[in-house]
Curated annotation (Swiss-Prot):
Entry keyword Cell membrane: no
Signal peptide: 1-38
Protein name according to UniProt: Common pilus major fimbrillin subunit EcpA
Protein encoded by which gene: ecpA
Family from the record: Belongs to the EcpA/MatB fimbrillin family.
Pfam hit, one: MatB
Function as written in the Swiss-Prot or TrEMBL entry: Part of the ecpRABCDE operon, which encodes the E.coli common pilus (ECP). ECP plays a dual role in early-stage biofilm development and host cell recognition. Major subunit of the fimbria.
UniProt keywords, alphabetically: Fimbrium, Signal
GO cellular component, one term: pilus
Inducing or repressing factors: Positively regulated by EcpR.
Source taxonomy: Bacteria, Pseudomonadati, Pseudomonadota, Gammaproteobacteria, Enterobacterales
Length: 211
């Protein structure tokens, strides 16, 4: 199973500016009475990535997410941008195999706001136009039925080789639904509370070598 770390945010520049101006005003008061001067308005933001490191070159199937996802709210469309999430797949060849199948299934996809609101966002996952869902497997490769995997086709060609084979492809991730408090659904994302949502999107991959 592989997962992407995600953050999503809605930010209002006006609020940030007001906080900065207030801080400057307080400093002015504490440092004495002087001639009033115009002050520059600045803002600063920090992005943080969760990080781990792992190496596995012996398992029969290894899937690695390449990069993280960051959804940003766009006021003009009252929605969030979509993201392309790349992944790398490595398999061990089985010289006795006559067919190979690779499927994916969504495991987790909920982001929760990092405050007391309880607001949530659900992330949809799409693979080459097919939804990856929790209720069933999405076929990515099925050599017995002529599904050779597109960008993952090196796996379809190398599943019965005597060495390891790798290939890369990607999912499309979008925000498909949300709540204001964990229960009340929203139809207009502009009504969501301000803040940052965080969580993991996990997709399980299953590989089958048939002899």
């Amino acid at each position: 199973m592989t997962h992407w770390d995600i953050t999503s945010s809605i930010q209002l520049g006006k609020k940030c500016n007001e906080k900065k101006v207030l801080a400057i005003a307080l400093v002015t008061v504490f440092t004495g009475m002087g001639v009033a001067q115009a002050a520059d308005v600045t803002a600063q933001a920090v992005a943080t990535w969760s990080a781990t490191a792992k190496k596995d070159t012996t398992s029969n199937l290894v899937v690695t997410s390449l990069g993280s996802l960051a959804f940003q709210y766009a006021e003009g469309i009252k929605g969030f941008n979509s993201q392309k999430g790349l992944f790398d797949v490595a398999i061990e060849g089985d010289s006795t195999a006559t067919a190979f199948k690779l499927t994916s299934r969504l495991i987790t996809n909920t982001l929760t706001q990092l405050d007391t609101s309880g607001s949530t966002l659900n992330v949809g996952v799409d693979y080459n136009g097919a939804a990856v869902e929790k209720t069933g497997d999405t076929v990515m490769i099925d050599t017995a039925n002529g599904v050779l995997g597109g960008n993952l086709s090196p796996l379809a060609n190398g599943y019965n080789a005597s060495n390891r084979t790798t290939a890369q492809d990607g999912f499309t991730f979008t925000i498909i639904s949300g709540t204001t408090n964990g229960t009340t659904a929203v139809t207009d994302y502009s009504t969501l509370p301000e803040g940052i949502w965080s969580g993991d999107v996990s997709v399980q991959f299953d590989a089958t070598w048939t002899s």
